[in-house]
């Protein structure tokens, strides 16, 4: 099976992706503040290798405030206030998972190390400007990532929250994989069905049904 190094390496040969990376690099060199830091842009792939992927959570673009984004969707670095969407994710977990205690942090690396790919569809953003890198080619790259998971893996649970993620998931083979959809956990839409979706217990039910070990979602509480 290919590794993420193979997949990302072959994309780096493509003209569209060369242009994406060159634009981000030139913006950094021009003194613009770009999140996450260059060393963290591909963190999701460093922490969750392709052959380890069991669950994919799709975000949009990185947080655009200081010290928040570190390459995992919805996650922030330790010591940074938990953002509103993640507050709602925790709220649903507390409702859905017996014994889940809302953590005081928003650092989700422990999920990534268990096979949860925390993937934003756009991997960089300019400070203070949401969606500023939405049309640089990142979307094409993350389409390729999803295609690779779709083709290489079996029985992955995709959690698609909000219209953007659901549109992105239209190519997923639902005979090979599981797709759970809900409104986005942002304060604007969480009450429309994200709270009550039960996706975390359902993910573990689907994994166990296939003989795969469930995700210890409680690892963030420890």
Swiss-Prot record:
Alphabetized InterPro entries for the sequence: UDG_fam1, Ura-DNA_Glyclase_AS, Uracil-DNA_glycosylase-like, Uracil-DNA_glycosylase-like_sf
GO BP term (any one): base-excision repair, AP site formation via deaminated base removal
Gene Ontology MF annotations: uracil DNA N-glycosylase activity
Catalyzed reaction equations: Hydrolyzes single-stranded DNA or mismatched double-stranded DNA and polynucleotides, releasing free uracil
Active site residues according to the UniProt entry: 61
GO terms under cellular component: cytoplasm
Subcellular location as annotated: Cytoplasm
Keyword Cytoplasm on entry: yes
Sorted UniProt keywords: Cytoplasm, DNA damage, DNA repair, Hydrolase
Entries under PROSITE patterns matching the protein: U_DNA_GLYCOSYLASE
Assigned EC number: 3.2.2.27
Family: Belongs to the uracil-DNA glycosylase (UDG) superfamily. UNG family.
Known function: Excises uracil residues from the DNA which can arise as a result of misincorporation of dUMP residues by DNA polymerase or due to deamination of cytosine.
Protein name, UniProt field: Uracil-DNA glycosylase
């Amino acid at each position: 099976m290919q590794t993420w190094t193979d997949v990302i390496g072959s994309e780096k040969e493509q003209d569209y992706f060369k242009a994406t990376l060159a634009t981000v690099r030139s913006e950094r060199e021009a003194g613009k503040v770009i999140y996450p830091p260059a060393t963290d842009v591909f963190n999701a792939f460093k922490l969750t290798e392709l052959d380890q992927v069991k669950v994919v959570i799709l975000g949009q673009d990185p947080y655009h405030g200081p010290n928040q984004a570190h390459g995992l969707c919805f996650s922030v670095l330790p010591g940074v206030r938990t953002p509103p969407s993640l507050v709602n994710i925790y709220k649903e977990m507390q409702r859905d998972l017996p014994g889940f205690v809302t953590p005081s942090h928003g650092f989700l690396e422990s999920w990534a190390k268990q096979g949860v790919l925390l993937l934003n569809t756009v991997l960089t953003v300019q400070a203070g400007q949401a969606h500023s890198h939405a049309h640089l080619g990142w979307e094409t790259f993350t389409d390729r990532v999803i295609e690779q998971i779709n083709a290489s893996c079996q029985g992955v649970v995709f959690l698609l929250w909000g219209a953007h993620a659901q549109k992105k998931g239209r190519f997923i083979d639902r005979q090979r994989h599981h797709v759970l959809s809900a409104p986005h956990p942002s304060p604007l839409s969480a009450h429309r069905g994200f709270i009550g979706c039960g996706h975390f217990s359902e993910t573990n039910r689907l994994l166990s049904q296939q003989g795969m070990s469930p995700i210890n979602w409680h690892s963030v509480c420890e």
